[in-house]
């Protein structure tokens, strides 16, 4: 689950991080009032969406008057912002954050943290190249990224934070200020089950003080049951409608941009299925894992979910019967096809527990379902059917 910038800054401020001042506005009048309250010669109006690249997409603008703040806010709110991190439809802008002007600054830094799956530990990343996409820095000048891995048994140590401060070129009081900032960020990360933390840029102001100009936080959705206050911050308008519906039925769904719908049980098998579709010249329209304990109702809902995507021209169902029985899946497929008006080819590959019985159910259903012998055969058949 992602947080908006204003939510991230409020959370981080609670842990002692110095953040750029800002006021949330949901319409033009509120934006104008926010400009007046900030009291500076300039202000920055930022569209609040769950996506990066807002500046280049016109979602971050400097304003010099209350009238301009109102005008910019009204031009953004109610529209969809398309960035390099969104799909072609973009993300809806329901509010803007009117921020204090902090520029010019001495320099812009970067500070971020993720859960490194290879070390199974929280890893901080810092760089002197703030204000640009960290992916670009990693690709072009990886030597400018400093990493610190935190031992979960002892937590982030002050000496680790000081070492990062030295590498960033900070001096004197800035070092202690940065240690406090990084320590607070680590505590926030652990307390709230972050999956991602990023401040870009972390500005060094003209007076030498540090300030978080932006804030990005991703929460581990598996931990929301124990984070009720964080869960209340969820903005469902920023989520893919089908992905949101899938979560209600405990389905793991990710929308893609292809035309072959996929229904698979098991994340590994789902990824392998998408790979072989690509290998055979097709384009998967989604990642959909119905899970090892899939029920008939969940399979029916999964089928509906796939077919709600109007770009889908065919469906490949790939089931390995382990915990789940292939005959139960077959019955669910038949029920779904009968319930929904399916006008696209459907290829089914069943393997494992009761696979023969499942194939028999499909063959005797009288429906236009194509059986496949093996994953290779299934991919070839669905790609051929879609391209026919």
UniProtKB/Swiss-Prot annotation:
Known partners and oligomeric status: Heterotetramer of two alpha and two beta subunits.
Source species taxonomy: Bacteria, Pseudomonadati, Pseudomonadota, Betaproteobacteria, Neisseriales
Top-level class of the enzyme under EC nomenclature: ligase
Keywords: ATP-binding, Ligase, Magnesium, Metal-binding, Nucleotide-binding, Tricarboxylic acid cycle
Keyword hit for Transport: no
InterPro entries: ATP-grasp (IPR011761), ATP-grasp_succ-CoA_synth-type (IPR013650), ATP_grasp_subdomain_1 (IPR013815), Succ-CoA_synthase_bsu_CS (IPR017866), SUCC_ACL_C (IPR005811), Succ_CoA_ligase-like_bsu (IPR005809), Succinyl-CoA_synth-like (IPR016102)
PANTHER family registered for this protein in UniProt: SUCCINATE--COA LIGASE [GDP-FORMING] SUBUNIT BETA, MITOCHONDRIAL (PTHR11815:SF10), SUCCINYL-COA SYNTHETASE BETA CHAIN (PTHR11815)
Keyword Acyltransferase annotated: no
Gene Ontology terms: cellular component: cytosol; succinate-CoA ligase complex
UniProt GO MF annotations: ATP binding; magnesium ion binding; succinate-CoA ligase (ADP-forming) activity; succinate-CoA ligase (GDP-forming) activity
Source organism of the structure: Neisseria meningitidis serogroup C (strain 053442)
Positions of substrate binding: 265, 322-324
Family the entry assigns: Belongs to the succinate/malate CoA ligase beta subunit family.
Protein name per the record: Succinate--CoA ligase [ADP-forming] subunit beta
Pathway: Carbohydrate metabolism; tricarboxylic acid cycle; succinate from succinyl-CoA (ligase route): step 1/1
């Amino acid at each position: 689950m992602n947080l908006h910038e204003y939510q991230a800054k409020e959370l981080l401020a609670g842990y002692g991080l110095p953040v750029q001042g800002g006021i949330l506005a949901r319409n033009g009048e509120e934006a104008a009032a926010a400009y007046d309250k900030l009291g500076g010669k300039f202000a920055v109006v930022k569209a609040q969406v769950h996506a990066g690249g807002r500046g280049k997409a016109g979602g971050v603008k400097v304003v010099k008057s209350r009238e301009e703040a109102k005008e910019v806010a009204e031009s953004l709110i109610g529209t969809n912002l398309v960035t390099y991190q969104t799909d072609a439809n973009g993300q809806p802008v329901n509010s803007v954050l009117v921020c204090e002007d902090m520029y010019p600054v001495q320099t812009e830094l970067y500070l971020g943290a993720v859960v490194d799956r290879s070390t199974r530990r929280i890893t901080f990343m810092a760089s002197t190249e703030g204000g640009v996409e960290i992916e670009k820095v990693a690709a072009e000048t990886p030597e400018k990224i400093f990493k610190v891995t935190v031992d979960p048994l002892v937590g982030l140590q002050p000496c680790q934070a000081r070492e990062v401060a030295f590498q960033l070129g900070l001096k004197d009081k800035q070092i202690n200020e940065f240690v406090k900032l990084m320590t607070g960020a680590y505590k926030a990360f652990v307390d709230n089950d972050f999956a991602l933390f990023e401040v870009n840029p972390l500005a060094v102001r003209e007076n030498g003080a540090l300030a978080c100009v932006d804030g990005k936080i991703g929460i581990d959705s598996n931990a929301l049951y124990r984070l009720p206050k964080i869960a209340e911050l969820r903005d469902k308008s920023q989520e893919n409608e089908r992905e949101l519906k899938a979560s209600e039925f405990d389905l793991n769904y990710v929308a893609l941009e292809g035309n072959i719908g996929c229904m698979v049980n098991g994340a590994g098998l789902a990824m392998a299925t998408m790979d072989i579709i690509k290998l055979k010249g097709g384009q998967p329209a989604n990642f959909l894992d119905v899970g090892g304990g899939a029920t008939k109702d969940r399979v029916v809902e999964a089928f509906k979910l796939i077919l709600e995507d109007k770009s889908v021209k065919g469906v490949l169902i790939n089931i390995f019967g382990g915990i789940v029985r292939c005959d139960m899946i077959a019955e669910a497929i038949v029920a779904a096809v009968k319930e929904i008006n399916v006008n696209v080819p459907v290829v089914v590959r069943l393997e494992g527990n009761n696979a023969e019985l499942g194939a028999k159910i499909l063959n005797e259903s009288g429906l236009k379902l194509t059986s496949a012998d093996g994953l290779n055969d299934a991919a070839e058949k669905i790609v051929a059917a879609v391209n026919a």
